Amino acid sequence: MKHLTEMVRQHKAGKTNAIYAVCSAHPLVLEAAIRYASANQTPLLIEATSNQVDQFGGYTGMTPADFRGFVCQLADSLNFPQDALILGGDHLGPNRWQNLPAAQAMANADDLIKSYVAAGFKKIHLDCSMSCQDDPIPLTDDIVAERAARLAKVAEETCREHFGEADLEYVIGTEVPVPGGAHETLSELAVTTPDAARATLEAHRHAFEKQGLNAIWPRIIALVVQPGVEFDHTNVIDYQPAKASALSQMVENYETLIFEAHSTDYQTPQSLRQLVIDHFAILKVGPALTFALREALFSLAAIEEELVPAKACSGLRQVLENVMLDRPEYWQSHYHGDGNARRLARGYSYSDRVRYYWPDSQIDDAFAHLVRNLADSPIPLPLISQYLPLQYVKVRSGELQPTPRELIINHIQDILAQYHTACEGQ
């Protein structure tokens, strides 16, 4: 069943429903999401970005086929039906190769698209908005659209070759800030204008026509725009519906199209719901989920220090800090200020650059050590109340087992619950 096309159809019919996209490769985040979708009997959209996963391995070391295998194996182990699982590729284009000449970057992008589509990813976000080494800055709408159409043609051919039919669903366009949270401190954010959104759509329609791709236009289900939501290290720019009202009304003129909103992390439940009502019917969430994972782990590390002799502790927080200092490439260009400001950002920033470090073997060993230390005997309830108060309420009511893994997963699911509630149609 084409869950996304059906969601869009219902939304356009006035149901004010939506779907959220889980943008993470962390096993505990994915387990939390799969179990939550299973309990609520909803489809689950999981997306990999072109930074995380590509034909060369991305920063996770996984190709699209590897990522699909990893997610499907996890879903099978949790008895989640694969036909309820939707895999998406985010910001697919020359993003990873902006330092190369355009011809070379786009050749890599062709292969990127082939690898995602051949692996069975069905939601494809075509994003060619970034300038390559020999490109003007910024690119014109026409160049962006021509490159996206070229990739769409590759995607269609690959899909037919591997699956006998072309059943992909596409997202086009981009938000203005770079993927993964803003680098700088923010105070105000420009909302995409209706004219800019229309220009993007028309440029893409024209470019797709030139490639003989008219027939796929109804499968372009969403346009990525900037509704005025973003976060930096310590601040969140909240959705202001009045500023996006003209943009929201503009999409009502398109029969099969809704908006996709990126960087919705840390918005209030009320803002998430209002975004859905205003036709931002695909809500992307990623850093907020690994932020919740990090919160739970820091809380458990504090509990461990109360219960376990210092020599036997995992030292998770210190191990994490040491590895981040030894390998600063994932945070150095994002976190500024004096030593103390950077230390705080490494641990607590909304941008959650720490998420890039969880796969590190030293950190993973410390995580396993922490879980072992706290799994040996029951965690005292007063300590759960002190450090994980929301989970404490559920433990006391009997709906949650107070084991380290269950406490972590439930804390992540508290964020997923906000998205689920926002996406439930009337």
Curated annotation (Swiss-Prot):
One of its GO terms (biological process) is phosphoenolpyruvate-dependent sugar phosphotransferase system. It comes from the Bacteria. Pfam families: GatZ_KbaZ-like. Signal peptide: none annotated. Disulfide bonds: none annotated. InterPro entries: Aldolase_TIM, GatZ/KbaZ-like, GatZ_KbaZ_carbometab, TagBP_ald_KbaZ. GO terms for cellular component: plasma membrane. Pathway: Carbohydrate metabolism; D-tagatose 6-phosphate degradation; D-glyceraldehyde 3-phosphate and glycerone phosphate from D-tagatose 6-phosphate: step 2/2. Component of the tagatose-1,6-bisphosphate aldolase KbaYZ that is required for full activity and stability of the Y subunit. Could have a chaperone-like function for the proper and stable folding of KbaY. When expressed alone, KbaZ does not show any aldolase activity. Forms a complex with KbaY. Belongs to the GatZ/KbaZ family. KbaZ subfamily. This is D-tagatose-1,6-bisphosphate aldolase subunit KbaZ. It comes from Shigella flexneri.
